[in-house]
Amino acid sequence: MYDAFENDLTVELNSGNVTAVNAAVAVMKGQQIANGGSYLDDDGSGNARITTHLHDAKTEAVLDLVEELSGQPCIIGYHFAHDLERLKAAFPNAPIIGSGVIGHKLDSIIDDWNAGKTPVLLAHPMSAGHGLNLQGTGHAVIWYSLTWSLEVYEQFIRRLWRQGQKNHIVVHHIMAKDTVDEAIMMAIRRKDKTQQTLLNAVRDYIKRDTIETVDY
């Protein structure tokens, strides 16, 4: 399924008609597949989006990593709703900072995290990217699903990397080899905050057989 997606993307790029916005949409489709799920086409009923489960490779990698952390608190960043469903199945007791989590509930989650009572915290970077103080305990950030936005990427990490943090922050990227995950990482490393950088990174990724391999 992923190979078919990438073949279609390559044809579109070679046509010269792909804009930065088109590239962002295409990358999101490829990223879903790499993560282990995908939204199905809209059935026209107006119901909530239907998803299909594809694999658990990333989820299993996260489980292994959390085990290696030996109880060190970690915050896991996710993107899509079906990412969260897989992570909830893997970590059923983990609290979630995401859409609709506000007020006293959010305050309670933050207090427990900073008190060291939460071994695994699931968070959407857009919900936990600004204003939250999470530096009281854990120093491990796990990106289950990368964002191409440098601002969102940096702000999410800075929730832990703030005054009062006593440890070095360690950032782990769960990446599917030979997928758009690598293009997204290229975009982040270029430290360019414009959407055009993603399109450029996707083009370089498609031509990866002729460019130097980058270690992450």
Predicted regions span which residues?
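Conserved Helicase C-terminal RecA-like lobe
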Residues: 1-133, 199-216
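Short amphipathic alpha-helical segments
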Residues: 87-89, 132-136, 154-155, 185-186
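Flexible glycine-rich beta->alpha loop in the catalytic core of nucleotide-sugar glycosyltransferases
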Residues: 128, 147-148
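A short beta-strand element within the Helicase C-terminal
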Residues: 133-146, 170-173
